Amino acid sequence: MKKQGYKVAVDAVDSVGGVVIPVLLERMGVEVVKLYCEPTGNFSHNPEPVPENLTEICKVVKESGADLGVIVDPDVDRLALVCETGELFGEEYTLVSVADYVLSNTPGNTVSNLSSSRALRDVTEKHGMQHNASAVGEVNVTTLMKATNAVIGGEGNGGVIYPELHYGRDALVGVALFLTHLAKKGCKVSELKKEYPSYFISKNKIELTPDINVDEVLVKMKEKYASEKVTDIDGVKIDFPTEWVHLRKSNTEPIIRIYSESKDEESANALAHKIVGEIKEICRL
C-alpha cells in the first residue's frame, strides 16, 4: 500500500473517527489530510454523510490533490467516499465496491436491505453468487447474513458488514477493504466507479390523514402489482425488470416513505411520482 503513495482526505465531523481513521490510514502507509478530526463532540456540520453535508470535503479533496476522500459519521459505522475529482462516489456504492473486492477473493453470498441499490445484486451475480435482501435495519441484515452464510453485506447508507471480523457495520473495515481494492486495481477512484452499474435512488414520502389505514393502502398497492415480484417482509417492495420501488410506513406518524431506484434521477423520480399518484387515488386525496 505504501508504494502507491496514496493521499486521503478525512472528514470525521469532530468525533471519534478523527482519532481512529487517521491512525488506520497512516499504518497503511497513506498520507492523511485532516478535516474536522478533533474529537470535541461538537459536530462541525450536520453529521449525516449525505451530499448536502459533504461540500467542504469534496472541495478539500480536489484542492489538496488527494486520491480519495473519506467521511465517517460520529459512531464510525457509515462510510461515504469522494473521488479524486471532488465528486461523490455515492453512498450506495461503498458497499458495492467493497463487496466486489471481497467476492473476487472469497466466493460467497451477499445481503443488503430492501431499500439498498440493485447494484449489489448485479455485482454479486457477476461473481456467480447469490444476493438476498432483508428488512431494513442492521439486526435484520446480520440475521439474514448468518442464515445464508454471506461473506459480505450491509446497508446502502454506507454501512459495511464483514463477518470475518464481526457482525456489525464498521467504517474502518470499509476503508481498509476499499483502499486495498483500489490498490490492486491500480486505477483512480473515479475510474473504479465507472465499472459499476449506474443507478439512482430517489427518496420521497407522502403524508396521509390520521384516519387513513396505512396497512390497507399497502395491501392495495401489493394487489395492484401482483403480476410483478412483490416482497412484503418490510412494507411493500415492487421489483420491475429495470427498476424498483419500496413503500414503508412510519411507526410514529401517518406517512408512507417511498424509495425508488432506476437507471437515472429522472426515471427514479418519475416512478416515485407515479406511485404517489396511485396512493392518492387509493386514499381519494
Locate each region found by the language model.
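Phosphate-binding chemistry for phosphorylated carbohydrates and sugar-nucleotides
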Residues: 1-185, 192
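Phosphate-binding and adjacent anionic-ligand microenvironments
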Residues: 68, 106-285
